[in-house]
């Protein structure tokens, strides 16, 4: 069941990455990528941004135009502003509905591809051994624990393998995070040291002047 071993492990990796990055961040990134595709929603987003810029520009022109001295021009700008604002609000409302539907779809897919998938695999393959242990390698009490709840004795169940994957992925991810942070800190210190070496200190400059 090598393929099942890999599927369970990858599902835990994906879950860890989503939890580390943040589900909201992932949703926003997917939304931005979705808006890059040629579809009606992306065209609505482009039109919404255009109308927003037009509203801001007209508002600036209205502020720079006197409503008393240049009433005709100001009234014309006001009508254009109100019309653009109305269109912008309509596009913004439509885009908000699209984003709500998109977020719901993404959350559903994320649940069924991570948590839902793990629950299904653990239920469907509860009697399927992930791999067999060498005979007599561990006491039978340990074999019973490793095969819990329904796998044959002397094998490792999918529930136990899933727990091992959770622990290993979490520890590996935390260790990798510490390594990356230490590397970033070292690079930052080196950059500061090079900057300080390239600049003469103030006491030395004063000595040269004296």
UniProtKB/Swiss-Prot annotation:
Q: How does it sit in the membrane?
A: Multi-pass membrane protein
Please indicate which superkingdom the organism of origin belongs to.
Eukaryota
Q: Which Gene3D superfamilies match?
A: Helix hairpin bin
Q: Which residue stretches, if any, does this entry annotate as coiled coil?
A: 43-97
Q: Does the keyword Aminoacyl-tRNA synthetase apply?
A: no
Q: Where in the cell is it found?
A: Endoplasmic reticulum membrane
Quick one: where is this thing mainly located?
endoplasmic reticulum
| Disulfide pattern | none
Task: List the ranges whose topology is Lumenal.
Answer: 1-4, 132-155
Cite the entry's keywords alphabetically.
Answer: Coiled coil, Endoplasmic reticulum, Membrane, Transmembrane, Transmembrane helix, Transport
Role this protein plays: Required for the post-translational delivery of tail-anchored (TA) proteins to the endoplasmic reticulum. Acts as a membrane receptor for soluble GET3, which recognizes and selectively binds the transmembrane domain of TA proteins in the cytosol.
Question: Can you tell me which family this protein belongs to?
Answer: Belongs to the WRB/GET1 family.
Annotated PANTHER family: GUIDED ENTRY OF TAIL-ANCHORED PROTEINS FACTOR 1 (PTHR42650:SF1), TAIL-ANCHORED PROTEIN INSERTION RECEPTOR WRB (PTHR42650)
Q: Which protein are we looking at?
A: Protein GET1
> Source gene?
GET1
């Amino acid at each position: 069941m090598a393929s099942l071993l890999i599927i369970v492990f990858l599902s835990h990796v994906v879950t860890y990455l989503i939890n580390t990055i943040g589900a909201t961040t992932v949703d926003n990134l997917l939304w931005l990528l979705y808006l890059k595709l040629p579809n009606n929603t992306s065209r609505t987003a482009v039109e919404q941004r255009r109308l927003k810029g037009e509203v801001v520009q007209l508002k600036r022109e209205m502020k720079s135009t006197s409503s008393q001295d240049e009433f005709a021009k100001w009234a014309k700008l006001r009508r254009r502003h109100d019309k653009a604002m109305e269109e912008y609000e309509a596009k913004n409302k439509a885009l908000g509905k699209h984003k709500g539907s998109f977020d719901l779809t993404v959350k559903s897919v994320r649940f069924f591809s991570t948590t839902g998938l793990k629950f299904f695999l653990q239920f469907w393959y509860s009697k399927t051994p992930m791999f067999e242990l060498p005979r007599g390698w561990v006491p039978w009490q340990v074999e019973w624990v490793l095969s819990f709840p329904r796998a044959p004795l002397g094998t490792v169940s999918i529930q136990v393998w899933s727990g091992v994957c959770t622990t290993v992925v979490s520890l590996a991810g935390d260790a990798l995070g510490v390594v990356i942070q230490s590397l970033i800190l070292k690079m930052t210190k080196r950059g500061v040291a090079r900057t300080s070496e390239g600049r003469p200190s103030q006491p030395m400059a004063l000595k040269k002047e004296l």
